[in-house]
Swiss-Prot record:
Family of this protein: Belongs to the transposase 11 family.
High-level lineage: Bacteria, Pseudomonadati, Pseudomonadota, Gammaproteobacteria, Enterobacterales
Protein name from the UniProt record: H repeat-associated putative transposase YdcC
Domain of life where this protein originates: Bacteria
Species this protein is from: Escherichia coli (strain K12)
Entry's Gene Ontology molecular function annotations: DNA binding; transposase activity
């Protein structure tokens, strides 16, 4: 993930400024912004401060002929960048430097940038849908929608940008749509969709096929696992079966449908010497030839997008508190955070969490340089 490759892809982003007004190169402004965010910057002034503190370092990678741009210039330029071109560069960069395994599970999930709404301009908060390689903990693509409800139309657009051949694509119930299933199959991938009330007939078929007695004593391929932590004990039972004859009609509606899958969670909460038992049942459909154990691994991997991406964005990078909203800036800044997470995640030399890596990058130029040049990265 060398910086040189990234900047090569970024160089195709068009700069719409009038040439005679350009005091700072677009590539320099983006280079500064990316380095600053890797080092913990959360806003425009933070980025300017980073630049003023590290001018000699930045000149090793960019021109900065007229010095470091002020925060107003950074904000104005970044907010005018085409999000479509930026996302294209991001995806091409990831394709160039990251080879995904055919066994990878790609989790597609959305996240609302809570403070990106602009009341004065009557603009709602934006919703960013990310494609996350659970095997490598890397963001491999992203696209913006104006509302969560628009995920249904945005997911196919995101899939168009990705190479998903041989991969399993997971989504929540919002993404459980026949058109999306067909698209994934046409692109050579497999799907694993959560099923809820938005697919009424399918959900009812599951309830009839898997009554409580079946869940307690499954007749199909099953796999159980248990976990104890924080005064809580959880047993997860996973059941997988072929589509039975009485439900064969669903295979004509859902392209490639092979398996019906059920995940049952029995959770015991130990409080004041009493055990409270909770049971949760979740249904899934899949075109992949899954065993119960592989199904358990796939849905567990799907939740990596929450704790290895969304949690990091909110807790470590304070994304939910970010009030950047000028022009296209909120969407662009979200993408730059993804770049920073990918670069730092791939550093295998310094064994530490994201927050500590960001602090080290801010304090240690040698470490920042090693991260940017890709030395020691897998």
């Amino acid at each position: 993930m060398e910086l040189k490759k990234l900047m090569g892809h970024i160089s195709i982003i068009p700069d719409y400024r009038q040439a005679w007004k350009m005091e700072h190169k677009l590539s320099d402004i983006l280079l500064l912004t990316i380095c600053a965010v890797i080092s913990g910057a959360e806003g425009w002034e933070d980025i300017e401060d980073f630049g003023e503190t590290h001018p000699d370092f930045l000149k090793q990678y960019g021109d900065f002929e007229n010095g470091i741009p002020v925060h107003d210039t950074i904000a104005r330029v970044v907010s005018c960048i085409s999000p479509a071109k930026f996302h294209e560069c991001f995806i091409n960069w990831m394709r160039d430097c990251h080879s995904s395994d055919d066994k990878d599970v790609i989790a597609i999930d959305g996240k609302t940038l809570r403070h990106s709404y602009d009341k004065s301009r009557r603009r709602g908060a934006i919703h960013v849908i990310s494609a996350f390689s659970t095997m490598h903990s890397l963001v491999i693509g992203q696209i913006k929608t104006d509302e969560k409800s628009n995920e249904i139309t945005a997911i196919p657009e995101l899939l168009n940008m990705l190479d998903i051949k041989g991969k399993i694509i997971t989504t929540d119930a919002m993404g459980c749509q026949k058109d999306i299933a067909e698209k994934i199959q046409k692109q050579g991938g497999d799907y694993l969709f959560a099923v809820k009330g938005n697919q009424g007939r399918l959900n009812k078929a599951f309830e009839e096929k898997f009554p409580l007695k079946e869940l307690n004593n499954p007749a199909h391929d099953s796999y159980a696992m248990s976990e104890k932590s924080h005064g809580r004990e959880e047993i997860r039972l996973h059941i997988v079966c072929d589509v039975p004859d009485e439900l064969i009609d669903f295979t004509f509606e859902w392209k490639g449908l092979k398996k019906l899958c059920v995940a049952v969670s029995f959770r015991s909460i130990i409080a004041e010497q009493k055990k409270e038992l909770e049971m949760t049942v979740r249904y899934y459909i899949s075109s992949a030839d899954l065993t119960a154990e592989k199904f358990a691994t796939a849905i567990r991997n799907h939740w990596h997008v929450e704790n290895k991406l969304h949690w990091r964005l909110d807790v470590v990078m304070n994304e939910d508190d970010c009030k950047i909203r000028r022009g296209n800036a909120a969407e662009l800044f979200s993408g730059i955070r993804h770049i920073a997470i990918n670069i730092l995640t791939n550093d295998k030399v310094f064994k530490a969490g994201l927050r500590r890596k960001m602090r080290k990058a801010a304090m240690d130029r040698n470490y920042l340089a090693s991260v940017l040049t890709g030395s020691g990265l897998s």
